[in-house]
Design a protein with these regions (language model features):
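A short amphipathic alpha-helical interaction element
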Residues: 54-101
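Exported/periplasmic cell-wall-interacting domains
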Residues: 263-334
Length: 334
């Protein structure tokens, strides 16, 4: 995955070409096509063992997987206790009426123990995981525009997104095993792939770098780490609404809209795919040119800055997109 112009996700224009949008409002919205596919069961992965031993699972990995399944995402699961995991713990604690310290105490461990299911599961790599194509994604935007699709660059990257994990973690869990060979049985995080309830409100907290989904009573039932704004392109604080949802969006790059663009850049139409600058989903907001979207580099979420938009991992953006619709209130706050 290429990191160049990751911030080129806001002050943008997206062409709406796909017929199916998550909206009733006929007003045009940024375009999609192919939703991100979570680790849906297949004949191969439902055969023999579908769970893996949890006996040797690292404590931090265990916590990250349980938080993911509880809908308080730590972002990319990597087995490391970092800021995203601590924010997820704090959100989980608030949901359960516990002091939101972001630290693992006895009460938090007990609440996490109530999250059902094994930590790891066994997945059999299928042909679709490894057949590609796996293009080398160029850094230059015009060169990107010359590709048919900005797909995954490797089977490891594709499997990482499927299981909300870093490719390095998958390699660590499966020493000596080929991630790019159909038929390989892998230990993978047993992550959440179900849909969330419909959200009555989206809340983005700039200071805490999280996006939250709340019910009609204002109770937060899901939380995701996010990247929001910068000194040059601040998050547009205020109350907005969702215009609509577009999957697999085409990104219309206009260098005039970016303070850090290369002076030699020209306008370009960037094809869809998980390595598109806005990832697999664009949730259009009533604030012109702004939206909630995915990313080609999940490891950077919550740790970098954007051009004003709200950036999530692709799998988080997909979950949020399925939980909102036209008119859903969005509060962007300090």
């Amino acid at each position: 995955m290429n990191t160049t112009l990751l911030g080129a996700a806001c002050a943008l224009s997206l062409a709406l070409t796909a017929p199916a949008l998550a909206q009733d409002d006929p007003a045009p919205v940024p375009q999609p096509d192919e939703p991100y596919a979570g680790p849906a069961s297949t004949a191969e992965d439902e055969s023999p063992a579908t769970t893996a031993s949890d006996h040797d699972v690292d404590e931090t990995l265990r916590v990250q997987v349980l938080l993911d399944r509880a809908n308080f995402s730590p972002g990319e699961i990597d087995g490391a206790m970092g800021s995203n995991t601590r924010r997820a713990i704090a959100g989980f604690q608030r949901y359960h009426g516990l002091p939101d310290t972001g630290e693992l105490d006895a009460a938090t461990r007990k609440a996490l123990d109530d999250v059902s299911g094994p930590i790891l599961t066994t997945y059999t790599v299928v042909a679709d995981d490894v057949d590609g194509p796996f293009p080398d994604i160029p850094a230059d935007m015009e060169a990107k525009a010359g590709l048919e699709r900005l797909g995954y660059e490797s089977a490891a990257e594709a499997l990482g997104e499927k299981f909300h994990a870093s490719p390095d973690l998958l390699r660590k869990l499966n020493p000596g095993k080929a991630l790019d060979r159909a038929g390989t049985r892998l230990k993978v995080p047993n992550v959440n792939t179900g849909k969330l309830p419909a959200a009555d409100k989206v809340i983005v907290d700039k200071s805490d770098s999280v996006l939250m989904l709340a019910d009609e009573d204002g109770r937060v039932f899901a939380q995701f780490p996010t990247t929001t704004g910068s000194e040059h392109d601040p998050l547009p604080i205020g109350d907005w609404k969702v215009n609509g949802v577009a999957r697999d969006p085409v990104f219309h790059y206009n260098p005039d809209l970016f303070w850090d663009a290369d002076p030699s850049d020209t306008r370009a139409e960037i094809p869809p795919g998980p390595n598109n600058p806005v990832g697999v989903v664009w949730i259009d907001l009533s604030k012109e040119h702004y939206g909630i979207h995915g990313t080609p580099v999940p490891s950077t979420i919550g740790k970098t800055q954007s051009h004003g938009c709200i950036r999530l991992t692709n799998w988080s953006a997909d979950l949020v997109a399925a939980s909102v619709g036209p008119g859903t209130p969005v509060e962007l706050r300090e």
